[in-house]
UniProtKB/Swiss-Prot annotation:
Interacts with the Sec translocase complex via SecD. Specifically interacts with transmembrane segments of nascent integral membrane proteins during membrane integration. InterPro entries: Membr_insert_YidC, Membr_insert_YidC_N, YidC/ALB3/OXA1/COX18, YidC/Oxa/ALB_C, YidC_ALB_C, YidC_periplasmic_sf. The chain crosses the membrane at residues 7-24, 365-385, 435-455, 474-494, 509-529. Its main location: membrane. The gene is yidC. One of its GO terms (cellular component) is plasma membrane. GO terms for biological process: protein insertion into membrane; protein transport. This is Membrane protein insertase YidC. Required for the insertion and/or proper folding and/or complex formation of integral membrane proteins into the membrane. Involved in integration of membrane proteins that insert both dependently and independently of the Sec translocase complex, as well as at least some lipoproteins. Aids folding of multispanning membrane proteins. Belongs to the OXA1/ALB3/YidC family. Type 1 subfamily.
Length: 553
């Protein structure tokens, strides 16, 4: 039994360490074993003020080969146009008509009731914005100051379903651009229409670029866990491709460079933004580093030649909001993949589907976690029973095993032969309890990532003192229950004959319990319920086996 338990603990511990380290490296963070350069928070990336953010011509995407470069107009006074809908508070910078600030009014910051998550921002300490412009000539781009058309109400009132804000560029290269943002009630999808008017005397063939620009400042995540932060690309050909900031640093990023479908995104824990061009429109995809700590991902969509006096419309959608899986599935193919489960996606997605169905019946995510854990334990009960039966049989013969070890302690070969004979006589497999446990590990790891990645847990209460399942227990009641359950579970298992192993078995619950003090309450709730059910199962099976043995032959 001591061999089996040792193997299990070693497998579990090493798996946890390697998973954590691989997750670190996979998401651009330093490895515990292979040190690498780390990202630093950006300095003022262009800055922002009441007159709008400033940018330079050098940050305009490269145009197609042979195209004339765009120039920057003389400095002009820009403004920040504030707007408000039922889901957003934001600011549009008239320099470029750039979406420079976006606060999610239905997503609290988890700490103060009157503060909300700000997704887009452009300050001295943080840059994250969405912008567009034209390439292919000396055409308007995101450095030019636009003029708001038809200034008026910039708030979505009670009787409105949509809010439109339009901005007109100066004429450059014989071209004028009118950019219109359309906000819809209850929606995190923003319509972005780019109308290109040829007011010159010669045909023009511009290219529209749409990009997301972000620094590499890390977002807050639960301690001992990291989720992906950076650009992502989706196409029908290559599907979902994450791009590490570290690969952009080295100019080694590998992703699909052209398509007529899909989207580009910036992904972080719980939230994402994505440009979604029209399906069927050919576009080039790019992702690059543009400053010491500033990156961008975007698309360049060519426009057919526009004759003098004619115009062309390029329509796209911009998603900016929480990674709610069902909502994302209805917006664009593959967009739900920004909710990143990593390599356990194939198991995690069905688990979340089931968790969501249970929530639909009980209306509380905490109780949904409890019921899902109960359901999983019920499904795996036959495997757990086999494991506990094996453990019980090993516990029965432990005194005889210890006697054999003492008897042959000077001759390891004879000791091993005697132990194998004992196993054969008693029809006990020392590793019989391992396989059932190993089979269950991927499911429980997947459920861990489901609870960690699901924005639905943010602000979701359970009972009494648990007001947010995505935050740690404020009174540490669940972590204490977790520690107690681990000690009880350990005490039900046979004590290893080796004193060193026995001490290790006592130390491991302490080590893991300390970690759980910093985990989100939803995760700890899952592990507490799982442990309590495991204890009940083990106690029931052990009593049942004991009752059978007491019956007369």
């Amino acid at each position: 039994m001591d061999i089996k338990r040792t193997v299990l603990w070693v497998i579990f511990f090493m798996s946890a360490v390697m998973l954590y380290d691989n997750w670190q490296r996979d998401h651009g963070r330093p490895s515990m074993f292979f040190p690498s350069a780390t990202h630093t928070a950006p300095a003022a990336a262009g800055g922002a003020s009441g007159t709008g953010a400033t940018t330079t011509a050098g940050d305009v995407p490269a145009a197609a080969a042979g195209a004339a470069p765009s120039t920057t107009a003389p400095a002009a006074q820009a403004q920040l146009v504030k707007f408000s809908t039922d889901v957003y508070d934001g600011e549009i910078d008239t320099r470029g008509g750039t979406l420079a600030k976006l606060t999610l009014k239905k997503q609290g910051d988890g700490k103060q009731p009157d503060l909300y998550i700000t997704l887009f921002d452009h300050t001295a300490g943080h840059t994250y914005l969405a912008r567009t412009g034209l390439l292919g000539g000396d055409f308007p781009n995101h450095n030019d100051v636009y003029t708001q058309l038809n200034p008026g109400s910039t708030s979505l009132t009670g009787d409105q379903n949509t809010l439109k804000l339009s901005f007109e560029s100066p004429v450059k290269g014989g071209v004028k651009v009118v950019k219109t943002y359309t906000f819809t009630r209850g929606s995190y999808v923003i319509g972005v229409d780019t109308k290109i008017d040829n007011v010159g005397t010669a045909p023009v063939t511009p290219t529209v670029y749409m990009e997301l620009v972000r620094d590499n400042t890390a977002v807050e995540t639960p301690m001992f866990s990291h989720t992906f932060l950076g650009p992502a690309v989706y196409t029908d050909a290559k599907h979902f491709q994450k791009i590490d900031f570290s690969d952009l640093d080295k100019n080694k990023a590998n992703f699909e460079k052209s398509a007529d479908n899909g989207w580009v995104a910036m992904v972080q824990h719980y939230f994402a933004s994505a440009w979604i061009p029209q399906q069927g429109a050919k576009r080039d995809i790019y992702a690059e580093k543009i400053d010491p700590a500033l990156y961008r991902v975007g698309v360049k969509q060519p426009v057919a030649a526009i004759a003098p006096g004619q115009s062309a419309d390029v329509q796209a959608r911009l998603f900016a909001g929480p990674e709610e899986e069902r909502m994302l599935e209805g917006i664009a193919p593959g967009l739900e993949l920004v909710k990143d489960y990593g390599w356990v996606t194939i198991i995690a997605k069905p688990l979340f589907w089931l968790l969501e169905k249970i929530h639909g019946y009980v209306g509380n995510w905490g109780w949904a976690i409890v019921l899902l854990t109960v359901l999983i334990k019920a499904v795996f009960f036959p495997l757990s029973a086999a494991s506990y039966k094996s453990m019980a049989r090993m516990k029965e013969i432990t005194p005889r095993m210890q006697a054999l070890r003492e008897r042959f302690k000077s001759d390891p070969q004879k000791m091993n032969a005697a132990l194998m004979e004992l196993y054969k006589t008693e029809k006990v497999n020392p590793f019989g309890g391992c396989l059932p446990v190993v089979i269950q590990i991927p499911v429980f790891i997947s459920l861990y990532w489901v609870l960690l990645a699901s924005v639905e847990m943010r602000g979701a209460p359970w009972i009494l003192w648990i007001h947010d399942l995505s935050q740690r227990d404020p009174f540490f009641i669940l972590p204490v229950l977790m520690a107690v359950s681990m000690f009880v579970q350990t005490s039900l298992n046979p004590t290893p004959p080796d004193p060193v192993q026995a001490k290790m078995m006592k130390f491991m619950p302490i080590a893991f319990s300390v970690m759980f003090f910093f985990f989100p309450a939803g995760l700890v709730l899952y592990y507490v319920v799982n442990n309590v059910l495991s204890i009940a199962q083990q106690y029931y099976i052990t009593r049942k086996l004991g009752g059978v043995k007491k019956k007369p032959a």
